Amino acid sequence: MVSVINTVDTSHEDMIHDAQMDYYGTRLATCSSDRSVKIFDVRNGGQILIADLRGHEGPVWQVAWAHPMYGNILASCSYDRKVIIWKEENGTWEKTHEHSGHDSSVNSVCWAPHDYGLILACGSSDGAISLLTYTGEGQWEVKKINNAHTIGCNAVSWAPAVVPGSLIDQPSGQKPNYIKKFASGGCDNLIKLWREEEDGQWKEEQKLEAHSDWVRDVAWAPSIGLPTSTIASCSQDGRVFIWTCDDASGNMWSPKLLHKFNDVVWHVSWSITANILAVSGGDNKVTLWKESVDGQWVCISDVNKGQGSVSASITEGQQNEQ
């Protein structure tokens, strides 16, 4: 059984939509309909407010930490159609960049693996996905995938930089030939896989169809070097699917139904070793799932938060969400 190790009183004045631990598990970022982003030091079970970031003009849906090799950087996205990138300099958090290239709510932000540099994917209700790449001296290059999802994009998640099968296939000392990929989920009930071509343009590689309602979240599992790629998806239809691909071409994906919940499922998140999946939904519960030896997914923990958002507490099983 997973126990709650800390409960953080964020003092947000409205619903909390996301809560993310940083790389080291010492800082917690939260965002809310009160238009604010807050950062807490949560070491040793404490909760010290480090920053209260104001810059959005609408509900803030999601936050994402960049890899610490680039400093303390946090991205946030909002109903106000903006993405803001915040950076800590000399102990003070400030806005370092604002992206206003979408025509509707920006629902999801996700940093690429650090091996690629500072690249942020952003999914919007206008149906487009934008990719922001830091080019140095405060400048960001923007690429846009228009009409990525009809009606809107709800979630983006990068594939790991580790090449599938590299643990057993990669010649010693040879640098892997990385191919940038990410997954997206949208209001067209689809999961789409995208890859960067040699000319730098992004191409739709695959459509994954299984959900019967809006896809609310997608999460590409971390790679541990084995020759399998795995993606989790969840939907307004209450279902969570685990998608696996074993072939080198990356074209043959097979879905397995993890569970059919009685309410919308908002988020899915992998443990850092990719063997446990956290699922949170409209029933105010976080459930943890693990694949058994016979290939079936079983619930190993059911944490009922009672009243309030499921994002407001941190459990041991979710600390390595990033």
From Swiss-Prot:
Chaperone recorded as keyword: no
UniProt repeat feature WD, residue ranges: 11-50, 55-96, 101-144, 148-204, 210-253, 260-299
GO molecular function, one term: identical protein binding
Localization annotation: Cytoplasmic vesicle, COPII-coated vesicle membrane; Endoplasmic reticulum membrane; Nucleus, Nuclear pore complex; Lysosome membrane
Membrane-topology annotation of the record: Peripheral membrane protein
PROSITE patterns assigned to the protein according to its UniProt record, in alphabetical order: WD_REPEATS_2 (PS50082), WD_REPEATS_REGION (PS50294)
InterPro entries, A to Z: Sec13/Seh1_fam, WD40/YVTN_repeat-like_dom_sf, WD40_repeat_dom_sf, WD40_rpt
Biological process terms in GO annotation: cellular response to nutrient levels; COPII-coated vesicle budding; COPII-coated vesicle cargo loading; endoplasmic reticulum to Golgi vesicle-mediated transport; mRNA transport; positive regulation of TOR signaling; positive regulation of TORC1 signaling; protein exit from endoplasmic reticulum
Activity regulation statement: The GATOR2 complex is negatively regulated by the upstream amino acid sensors CASTOR1 and SESN2, which sequester the GATOR2 complex in absence of amino acids. In the presence of abundant amino acids, GATOR2 is released from CASTOR1 and SESN2 and activated.
Residue numbers bearing the Phosphoserine modification: 184, 309
Modified residues (N-acetylvaline): 2
Subunit structure comment from the entry: At the nuclear pore: component of the Y-shaped Nup107-160 subcomplex of the nuclear pore complex (NPC). The Nup107-160 subcomplex includes NUP160, NUP133, NUP107, NUP98, NUP85, NUP43, NUP37, SEH1 and SEC13. At the COPII coat complex: interacts with SEC31A and SEC31B. Interacts with SEC16A. Interacts with SEC16B. Component of the GATOR2 subcomplex, composed of MIOS, SEC13, SEH1L, WDR24 and WDR59. The GATOR2 complex interacts with CASTOR1 and CASTOR2; the interaction is negatively regulated by arginine.
Its job: Functions as a component of the nuclear pore complex (NPC) and the COPII coat. At the endoplasmic reticulum, SEC13 is involved in the biogenesis of COPII-coated vesicles. Required for the exit of adipsin (CFD/ADN), an adipocyte-secreted protein from the endoplasmic reticulum. As a component of the GATOR2 complex, functions as an activator of the amino acid-sensing branch of the mTORC1 signaling pathway. The GATOR2 complex indirectly activates mTORC1 through the inhibition of the GATOR1 subcomplex. GATOR2 probably acts as an E3 ubiquitin-protein ligase toward GATOR1. In the presence of abundant amino acids, the GATOR2 complex mediates ubiquitination of the NPRL2 core component of the GATOR1 complex, leading to GATOR1 inactivation. In the absence of amino acids, GATOR2 is inhibited, activating the GATOR1 complex.
Family as reported in the entry's similarity comment: Belongs to the WD repeat SEC13 family.
Protein name as catalogued: Protein SEC13 homolog
Organism: Rattus norvegicus (Rat)
